[in-house]
Amino acid sequence: MLSRRRVFAVERLGGRDGAFEDLAQGCVVPGVTCTYRRIPDNTHECSLDFREGQNELRGLERQMPLLKLASQDSGMEMVVGDSSLATLSGLSQDSLNLEPMGSPELPPAQLDRLLARQKLEEVLERSREFPSLSAQRGPLQLLNKPVDGVPIFAGEQESTEADTELEAGLEEAKEVGNMESAACTCLPGQGLRYLEHLCLVLEQMVRLQQLYLQLQTQRPSRDPEEEVLAPALSSSHIPDNRVQEHREELSQTKDPEGAEAASLPEVGVLVTSPSRLPEALLEPTHILPPSQEPKDLSHWDKVKVLLNRLRWRSPRLPEPPVPPDGSGSRMEFRNLSDRTPCHSQRKTFIPALVVKKPRAKNLSV
């Protein structure tokens, strides 16, 4: 006989259809819309069973939170006697979220979630237990900060300090690799392992870049262009310096009185004779200190010195000793005035190149 009233009977654990076993395992309780129960003719037995079922439900409520009943989800009206089941305070809002509260029997999905959470907490605790790594990162960051626009260790650190810091960075990288292997063995999922590995690799790259920048600031290198230009400039100044050195040797070999007396006539000749002006302009002006002057002269350099001597030498009469009243300077100027027409009358032989044009032959065709 099927009941017309919307009432269902709750049976004991281990009953015929095992409704309470499903309830203990966290399944949705079948409501009135799912099944109809056969109600026995003896109403007294039904009421006793119903009361015992209520007591068992209260015991289960204390152990773990229950899900919503199907009758509550559907919004159907319940019988007056079922109001205690409908107004349970321990019912959860989400029928798919089960939070185990110490029950010994759990489904495998919940066990996996619990294990994942425990392993993540262990990883976080391990990361907090390594403050030495963060303490070592502090001085590396402070080294790269400039003071008033100038790096702290620019030109002041020695190579030994740089080597020790490099060794410390390599040791730290080894420690990071060990941590990475330990974290990979502890993390539950492949995605979390990949993220942890990526973070460790990025941290290691940052440390290596900081060490590289630190070494660059400690050992400033010269410009390659300056290194190339320096020997070229020194080689270009060598011949002029040699000529200047030979001229100084010539002036030292002369008598001191003759050198003093010949200084004014040479100046006068340079001013009066225009042919000597280009030679004076072409004289070298680069002078090196005596420590840098070349000492070894080749045969070709000696020949050049002799040619320069012949070019610079000018015929002049022997000067008399200079009297103290300064009349010698007047005599030198007179000699210069007498000597100037002789210089103008001298003819220098300059070979000229004459290009002969070939005569065009008229050919009759």
Curated annotation (Swiss-Prot):
Biased composition (Basic and acidic residues): 239-257, 331-341
A Pfam family matched in the record: DUF4657
Stretches for region Disordered: 218-262, 315-342
Protein's recorded name: Uncharacterized protein C8orf58 homolog
